[in-house]
Amino acid sequence: MPIITLPDGSQRQFDNPVSVLEVAQDIGAGLAKATIAGRVNGERHDACDIIEQDATLEIITAKDEDGLEIIRHSCAHLLGHAIKQLFPDVKMAIGPTIENGFYYDVDLDRSLTQEDIDAIEKRMLELAKTNYDVVKKRVTWQEARDTFEKRGEPYKMAILDENIERTAMPALYHHLEYIDMCRGPHVPNMRFCQHFKLQKVAGAYWRGDSKNKMLQRIYGTAWADKKQLAEYLTRLEEAAKRDHRKIGKALDLYHMQEEAPGMVFWHNDGWTIFRELETFVRTKLKQYDYQEVKGPFMMDRVLWEKTGHWQNYADLMFTTQSENREYAIKPMNCPGHVQIFNQGLKSYRDLPIRMAEFGSCHRNEPSGSLHGLMRVRGFTQDDAHIFCTEDQIESEVTSCIKMVYDIYSTFGFTNIAVKLSTRPENRIGSDEMWDRAEAGLAAALAHNGLEYEIQEGEGAFYGPKIEFALRDCLGREWQCGTVQLDFALPGRLDATYVAEDNSRKTPVMIHRAILGSIERFIGIITEEYAGFFPAWLAPTQAVVMNITDSQADYVQKVAKQLSDVGLRVKTDLRNEKVGFKIREHTLRRVPYMLVCGDKEIAEGKVAVRTRKGADLGTFTVEEFAEILKNQVRSRELKLLNEE
């Protein structure tokens, strides 16, 4: 007679073992109809699963995050059901959930077209509309293998052979005539899977191994209701408009080419933004008492072996040889900073030493993962390393956290998710060292009153870290900043200081990055601002234009006046209508357009318009210069009279 304890603390007693759905029915018909699955003693179970002993139970519905994930997982099965009906010879591989959706890897002897995807989606909807029940059956390992052998599913057989114990009882989910294997849980009825959209097809190797066969990966998104789906698709449309690759090309910021995959060719305007970011960060380095250094971008293999990178990071490092010596191009700056620290005797009185670098790093990322500025092979880190005593950890990490929020707020990022990543399986250093490092970061977060999520096993191989993820205007998260404790690397590279008792001690090293990769950060803010950079970042801050040739000299004079006070200004003296010029520079997202006609010349003024079409009236050149200088100096996000 199981006693079921519900989330509100109430209990229900049953005479016999009872399913999750039967408990929901006992509570009420409305809840039963909404039941997708249940959390029994904290673990997710199908609605049909039987509870035999006393347990806690939380009913999962479409309103829960878990419920939405289950809907998406079941939509992957629905995709399998539909494609198997349309293409009976297709071989099914895996179909997991991902953020906002799902995918299924399939093996088909021809490439799927958009027409095929449309047909699959149509068939999925037709099947879902029949509201059929999903039937779960536990079978022996051999029964499962026999089932998939008869159905001609080699990938399912491989999963059984390689990933599932012979003593296990796998769950098979029956979707009418279609059968899939999964840990579950899944929806009890396809009425929950009505709001989805297939999005694209991409290539994916079986098991993620390039030595294996290339499969076709069909991506889709699924939501609990029509409104959620529509809102998500609208966000996708907006994201496509804001794609930094598209905007970067339109604004002539940079380009990439086959001869240098993952490497950025910065054009003048893009490089202007890059340098402005560096200048801004430098002002903060001075404010927070950092010294700026520059290390070599290539060092001998011997050094990388000492640090542990050669053993733990070799696949991502570019290497070369010269005069019988093997070198690695640095994937990160930290070993070089330790070498600088090691030059000359250091005392505890010298600590903390805060060492910063705009370091040019290279990582041999897989070609398939490269994506515009967001995932590159060559990048610049706004990197810093702080050498300190254990007693200084909390205050130094606190200072880093303050600096992170200080810098992010300048760009308008105030919604920041904080995550603490703990020790990975593949790591260096003792457990005791990791205990101290993780406790130190947790203490600093607590001291600053920050809520954070723990990411088990996601730390770097040399230390735990705090990650700062920016949430942009579309609700996406971008992990940029990190603060990482390292008790291991200084010792490996023989870094010491003279302690107060005259003994030699190893300093603690704090790795700190805020923008992360400057390239990637430019990609992020390009999409956040949709290319409408604030005046201080805009490559061209104002364009001065004439109406007729008679104003050309005045235009040149105004432009020189503004340039002389440090503003980035261009002239447009083309023999085109002024409306055409305004439209063109509006498309180029230039913050201000200054029009000079005979009236403006007579008054010694300029007529000012913004890129959003606002007519600000006329100003003397001195007045406008002061306004724009103040906006640049204070790094304002908005233009004049802009909401």
Curated annotation (Swiss-Prot):
GO cellular component, one term: cytosol
Binding sites annotated in the UniProt record for Zn(2+): C334, H385, H511
Principal subcellular localisation of the protein: cytoplasm
InterPro entries the UniProt entry points to: aa-tRNA-synt_IIb, aa-tRNA-synth_II, aa-tRNA-synth_II/BPL/LPL, Anticodon-bd, Anticodon-bd_dom_sf, Beta-grasp_dom_sf, TGS, TGS-like
SMART domains, per the entry: tRNA_SAD (SM00863)
Top-level taxon of origin: Bacteria
Cofactor: Zn(2+)
Cofactor comment text: Binds 1 zinc ion per subunit.
Assembly with partners or alone: Homodimer.
Name of the protein this chain belongs to: Threonine--tRNA ligase
Lineage of the organism: Bacteria, Pseudomonadati, Pseudomonadota, Gammaproteobacteria, Pasteurellales
Name of the gene this protein is made from: thrS
